[in-house]
């Protein structure tokens, strides 16, 4: 039965992530990159500076850094550890190249999303700042496009329940925990109607369900406070170990880069025809890249709208750093690790097992230690992603049904139920379902970004004209003070 369902899901996935959607996502990022004059390169330094610098004025509930951490909590997850490995195994090393290309263009996309989220956000009767694609579609494109905003909100709520938010994250956690505590699956238990699983899976599902339920009841501020502490710390830990792996194998890096680039355009020359065409490499790279950094998906703007700032451009730049950290840095290191160690070519490995193999064979530490580090990173990454996506899903539901506490509570309980179910699903089914809903969610958002690209360019020019004048005035004032001091 599962094989038949998986076959149907794969066909739907291939249709959703066909050439049209990939062209839409890549061309949207390219359009914004060109119209903004390579802003993701020119203003990256300023963006990183503002990322950790709070702005005290302006509407909003949380700092820009807290908003970024909330967004990063939803983006830095299993996609960085499991998703990259899955993409390279399915699409060859070339998938990493297309993932990086999509992320570079996606930085401009994420900038536009953050800018529009703040520009078109609203404040409800409770004083909460609300925003995201549904609001910039409705207010920016006009009331006639409200149906498109509702389509986005519907699929956004579904992605939270069935995609990135729950199934893939808890499945990744349970796989990592089982791989560490019960690699031989000797602690087996048969669950009627479901199959045979390790007791570790059962315990993990119960513990995860309890922890998630305890946090999401607190809403965005509790999620933000947890994310602010956990996300930066765990990202640094994972970055150090992944970078160490690359440095310990630095002699292999040039050949790995050649392999990645060659496989991006001619996969058969590298894989011997096992993986397939350039389209397969591109499809896996772009799809997994979107899963990881969410640029173009429309999720991050929902968190960006809660940032305490009066300048849409400023928050757009801060949002942009999320894609840089998530994919350009973390995913690239994971991908290099998998290619350098040849983990992607080892038969019988899937998901987190591929990355675990890379760490165990690429670092001069014991297998148990490497597996423990990876498990801890994956658990925390995935846990914060689960929290972030509950917030996204609730905002989508609010847009569809209004501020109905009863419906929000029902959504939360369904979300908690999905967390409980996730560990018992197959890895293939989990990732296919996530890809399908990602694509359906990205489509209306990318249409809006094309339509509102002119607004993004105009708002950017206005801000930096004023910013340049302010810098000049500040410089003149500083010179005047120095001259007065000399006299």
Q: What do these predicted regions represent?
A:
Residues 1-78, 88-95, 106, 420, ...:
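N-terminal alpha-helical transmembrane segments of multi-pass membrane transport
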Residues 28-33, 73, 102-127, 134, ...:
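Helix-loop-helix module between adjacent transmembrane segments
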Residues 5, 36-40, 79-84, 160-173, ...:
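Transmembrane helix-loop junctions in multi-pass membrane proteins
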Residues 10-46, 89-128, 148, 326-333, ...:
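Extracellular loop-to-transmembrane helix junctions
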Residues 57-90, 116-140, 151-154, 158, ...:
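Alpha-helical membrane segments and immediately flanking helix-loop junctions
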Residues 33, 113-121, 125, 242-259, ...:
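Extracellular/periplasmic helix-exit of transmembrane alpha-helices
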Residues 38-64, 86-88, 92-96, 100, ...:
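Flexible loop linkers connecting adjacent transmembrane helices
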Residues 24-31, 39-48, 170-177, 199-261, ...:
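Membrane-interface loop-to-helix entry segments
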């Amino acid at each position: 039965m599962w094989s038949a369902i998986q076959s149907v899901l794969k066909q739907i996935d291939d249709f959703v992530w066909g050439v049209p959607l990939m062209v839409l996502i890549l061309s949207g990022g390219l359009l914004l990159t060109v119209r903004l004059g390579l802003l993701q390169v020119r203003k990256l330094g300023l963006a990183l500076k503002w990322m950790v610098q709070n702005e005290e004025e302006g509407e909003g509930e949380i700092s820009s850094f807290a908003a970024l951490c909330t967004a990063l909590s939803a983006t830095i997850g299993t996609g960085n550890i499991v998703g990259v490995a899955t993409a390279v195994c399915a699409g060859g090393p070339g998938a990493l190249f297309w993932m990086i290309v999509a992320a570079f263009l996606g930085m401009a996309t994420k900038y536009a999303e953050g800018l529009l989220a703040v520009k078109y956000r609203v404040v409800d009767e409770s004083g909460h700042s609300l925003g995201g694609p549904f609001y910039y579609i409705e207010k920016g494109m006009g009331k006639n496009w409200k149906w498109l905003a509702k389509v986005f909100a519907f699929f956004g709520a579904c992605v939270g329940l069935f995609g990135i938010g729950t199934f893939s994250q808890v499945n990744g956690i349970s796989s990592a925990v089982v791989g560490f505590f019960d690699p031989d699956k000797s602690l087996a238990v048969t669950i009627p109607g479901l199959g045979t699983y390790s007791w570790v899976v059962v315990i993990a599902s119960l513990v995860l369900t309890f922890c998630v339920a305890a946090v999401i009841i607190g809403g965005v501020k509790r999620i933000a406070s947890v994310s602010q502490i956990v996300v930066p710390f765990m990202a640094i830990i994972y970055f150090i170990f992944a970078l160490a792996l690359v440095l310990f194998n630095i002699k292999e890096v040039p050949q790995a880069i050649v392999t990645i680039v060659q496989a991006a355009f001619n996969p058969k020359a590298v894989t011997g025809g096992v993986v397939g065409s350039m389209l397969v490499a591109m499809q896996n790279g772009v799809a997994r890249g979107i899963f990881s950094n969410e640029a173009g998906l429309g999720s991050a703007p929902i968190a960006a709208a809660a940032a305490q700032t009066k300048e849409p451009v400023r928050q757009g730049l801060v949002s942009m750093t999320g894609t840089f950290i998530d994919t350009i840095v973390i995913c690239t290191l994971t991908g290099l690790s998998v290619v350098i160690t040849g983990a992607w070519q080892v038969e019988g490995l899937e998901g987190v097992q591929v990355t675990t193999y890379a760490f165990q064979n690429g670092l001069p530490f014991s297998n148990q230690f490497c597996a423990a580090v990876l498990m801890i990173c994956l658990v925390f990454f995935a846990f914060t992603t689960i929290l972030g996506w509950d917030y996204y899903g609730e905002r989508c539901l609010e847009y569809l049904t209004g501020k109905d506490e009863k419906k929000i509570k029902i959504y939360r309980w369904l979300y908690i139920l999905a967390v409980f179910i996730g560990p018992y699903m197959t890895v293939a089914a989990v990732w296919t379902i996530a890809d399908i809903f990602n694509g359906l969610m990205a489509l209306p958002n990318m249409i809006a970004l094309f339509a509102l690209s002119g607004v993004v360019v105009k708002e950017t020019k206005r801000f930096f004209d004023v910013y340049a004048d302010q810098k000049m005035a500040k410089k003149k004032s500083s010179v005047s003070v120095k001259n007065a001091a000399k006299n």
